[in-house]
Amino acid sequence: MLEKLEQIEARYEELGRLMGDPEVIADPEQLQKHARAHAALEDIVTTFRRYRQVSNELAEDKAMLEEEKDREFQELLKAEIERLTGEQERLEQELKILLLPKDPNDEKDIIMEIRAGAGGEEAALFAGDLFRMYQRYAEKKRWRTEIISSHPTELGGFKEIIFQVEGQGVYSRLKFESGVHRVQRIPTTESGGRIHTSTATVAVLPEAEEVDVEIKPEDLRVDIFCSSGPGGQSVNTTYSAVRITHLPTGLVVSCQDEKSQLKNKEKAMRVLRARLLDMARAEREGELAEERRSQVGSGDRSERIRTYNFPQNRVTDHRIGLTLHHLDQVLAGELDEIIDALVTTDQAERLKNMEA
């Protein structure tokens, strides 16, 4: 591990020198490329330098303890050795996590799809609650959200809503949200006051660049139609809505939220690229051995991942057994406590697999 860390430190220093090179400074593209690579290594190099400093101090204190005759000073040294040993172990664990292979999609923007599941109108209302929860979380993170396509219901829910989230590290934070979300509450339309259970499905797709997925024009069928509003009523007399079918896979994407046919087509293509990339990823992961899969979950959309219980103000993530009793705050976008726990569990599982 130390040899690898020394190589990373040498590369970090080399990048620092390159950023000061007049030729590189004169080329903004090269400068930006080196600056990004330098910033990506900063955390691991800072942690490694502190680890090395602590290790040196620890070795010096142990050597001094062997020579020291004064009882009082021996006790001081022992206390300092204990403190430094604890810090060294903590830093070593941090370095192991920092050395874990990065998910190549972690820095990508995402396309999130939320669909109402079992439960009729109540499921559609819950899909709307989830959309607003992620929207508020994005606001707190200073990320940008944009609705790509939506099918609203008359009571303010969504049969389906597809939206983009752009910002730093979006996929790394939201990738564990894929799966079936379950709600338990008394519907406003329920006169008997009985608790109903409804579901919504969330899919998180890293946004695909054109270079990530090759789509041949002859593989697409593009249909143009009039857009419609809640309950199927016509809201637009111009043919601006777009439906794209990818013939080799049978994937179909529709978009009607924009007044411009061109913009709807662009948005639909964005979703199609992301879905094709996700399909390729799922095929690759399907080939992996079961023991190499993350404990946090495979992102399988049929996996029930979380329950939101309104009467008890409780949210439970079933993958890690985490229960919180402030559902109201979670729905207001306070998701970090859950996401941090999921990330930590994923890191621990990957460390265990690497050490095995």
UniProtKB/Swiss-Prot annotation:
Keywords: Cytoplasm, Methylation, Protein biosynthesis. Residues 284-310 are annotated as: Disordered. Its main location: cytoplasm. It is found in: Cytoplasm. The keyword Cytoplasm applies. Pfam families: PCRF (PF03462), RF-1 (PF00472). The modification N5-methylglutamine is found at residue 233. Peptide chain release factor 1 directs the termination of translation in response to the peptide chain termination codons UAG and UAA. Belongs to the prokaryotic/mitochondrial release factor family. NCBIfam families: prfA (TIGR00019), PRK00591.1 (NF001859). This is Peptide chain release factor 1.
